[in-house]
């Protein structure tokens, strides 16, 4: 990142490497503050015409109005109102209607708070710069500087100090340290080599963001040409998040205009250590937000067999401005790779439960979006006090099954976090996540929160499967748990992948997708069919119970009670 400050698409980025403001005068004299005032005045012209017209008429031009805001703010941090007017009488315009000026100051503060704000430090080599000792401290000091400057201006104009203070996040919502590192870059991807890697992420929750889209549409198809060959990314516009998606080392390149999705990865996937990617070749590369000139959405993957790298691609357009396009492409890439490795991807949830009587069980609940897998976990959590001594979430959307050397089938996760609908969480639990969640479009349908729920060590430990259940969200049933002795019947239910859509995508009504997993198995169906029969046969031989759990999630009036009732019945079965 070469500029000290950029502002676009409601996102402000402040480069601490080039400019770090530690006094009020430095802050108010900075290029970044001027850009913020310019953007604020443009928003006034659009949304607060009366206020805009009043001041532009008084100062003759918009440029003079902007300069007068900046200069008067500088003076107000040092002098009282009378002294400011004495410096230059033109500033008296602001104090002729003091209430209007206070409203202007408040509106500017609100405008700044509504922006997504990021601070960045870039180091030319590891161990340099602010990040090792002072990065978090520098962000805390910057937050306090912005807050104290704003309050000083308010107090000076009012003529008295405030008596109630609210310690809000006035600096950055999130902060990144970047390192320039070398990785084993094939010649085809030399245009990616200069992009800095994210080494540290600091999030100031609650982080609330608004995106252009609120649902995801379609599936990702294989492409026959490499979309990354010969492209060159501008190091001023791009970042790399080195993620561990399950067992796959993944380099996620994202454009700065989709910053919230890149930062959201920190709550969802393990951030790799430098030793895990310096000089290494990744399993997966995903480029998110490349401006290729196409107006329509282009999202696909390509198998680079020569370099043994799976490539994901999403072009720059408003349609991809939803975290689902970041998360689900990465999971698709992961699953395609796991199928190549003869492992079976599972779209669902897995939990390790230890009951109060000491009995332990590892449960896999499989189902596509809206089937009730996450809601079942919430129901388990709500029953914690009555039944459970301990509960570990192995995965809460995507995982994979692996055949171990002793022949047992074990489950592994892909994510350390979850991207879940706020409406489907218990309200108390949803509010408990305020101190660590990234909230997206919280006032809209399909509002989401990305929260950490596990550790990488837990999801990659490997847990032997005891129960394998398909989440049926659309059939009424008095018996919530049904097991099948006929393996072919069970496989048909799992492969049919039926569920009633709940609005998490653009689908409606009763829909089906092969193996309830449009993120890999649908694209690689022939290979997956072989694996399904192998794994289900091995599980049956190993005594794993295979069946359905009726969540009733899509049945009118059952969205809350259905998963709860199913969880109670499941615990009774485990307890037998």
Q: What residue spans do the PLM features occupy?
A:
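Pre-Walker A adenine-sensing motif
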Residues: 340-356
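Short, glycine-/Ser/Thr-/acidic-enriched flexible segments
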Residues: 257-258, 317, 356-358, 370-371, ...
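Charged, amphipathic alpha-helical linker segments immediately N-terminal to NTP-binding catalytic cores
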Residues: 110, 288-345, 542-554
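Glycine-rich phosphate-binding P-loop
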Residues: 355-386
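Conserved NTP phosphate-binding and transfer environment spanning the P-loop NTPase/kinase superfamily
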Residues: 2-172, 176, 444-576
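Conserved nucleotide-sensing/catalytic segment adjacent to the nucleotide-binding pocket
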Residues: 388-458
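Extended, Lys/Arg-enriched charged tracts that mediate electrostatic binding to polyanionic substrates
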Residues: 192-284
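Phosphate/oxyanion-binding active-site loops and adjacent basic polyanion-contact surfaces
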Residues: 100-104, 322-330, 372-373, 527-528
